[in-house]
Amino acid sequence: MAPSNAARMQPDPDGDFPDRMTIRYVDGSAPASLWPDPEAAARRAGFRVVDRQVVPTARILAALSTALDLTEGQVPGHALRTCYLATRLADAVGLREADRETLFSAALLKDAGCSSNAAAITRLFGADDIVLKGRQATTDRGLLAYAAFTIRSLPATEPLPLRIRRLIHIGLTGSREQHQIEQLRCERGAAIARKAGFGEPVGAAILDLHEHWDGGGQPRGLRGAAIDPLARILAACQGLDIYVSTRSRADGIRVLSERRGTWYEPDVVDALLEACARGLLDDLLAPDIAARTFALEPGGP
């Protein structure tokens, strides 16, 4: 008969590698003589052992963010570049360490909810949601700008009567539906970040990312200081990268200046423009931007 405290093979208590086994006594303690090489004992017993590898969280998020860039219709590396700009700006303005950590994670996860509204966008415009998202990112606010965006976005392959009906529908309901689309995206992205364990501060920054300083943003129409402070930094940085990477450095700086006090917080814009004058954009499109960004990770190696 086996002793009452016999050693047995039990599943990995962490629960994240169900095929990995470890050796424990019945009472839960570990036999010290087996700890030097428990995996070898598991293999001898016929169990498959999955090696654990420690991969920095930033690298995992960066890989995921590249897929999100494509879904968002942006040049691959957009979230990484936004993260680079935001972290450099955080250093320049002396943001405290905890906020820098939140900002870094929120930048890489900022578009986590971007695929949640794909079906709604396609249904509304009848066109590829990825193309529309990329185009909308460089569309100004206002009735004329939105009308021009809508006309350009209608599928040319559709019969003219159908396009006219779609245009009328968007004119009558587009504002409400666009709000619902943006609300879904922001709320879903924040929820994903929270469920992934990044905490409420990261979720709050993602939720408020598309709010505008003057209250004209989405999804809640927040104004000024009511907007999450880290979201204000991310908003300006992501806007700058979109124009720099799809148009030119001059366009990025011009749009940033034009949106000062409307889309973006004036103090953030001023600090960002000052950093640009000191060469912030010099490395933005460098092929090793990922490595440069990882090197800025708060609390990183």
Predicted regions: what they are:
Residues 2-8:
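Extreme N-terminal basic, low-complexity initiation segments
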Residues 12, 16-19, 37:
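Intrinsic-disorder-associated, low-complexity terminal segments enriched in Asp/Asn/His/Tyr and depleted
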Residues 34-35, 46-301:
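Histidine- and acidic-residue-rich, metal-dependent catalytic cores
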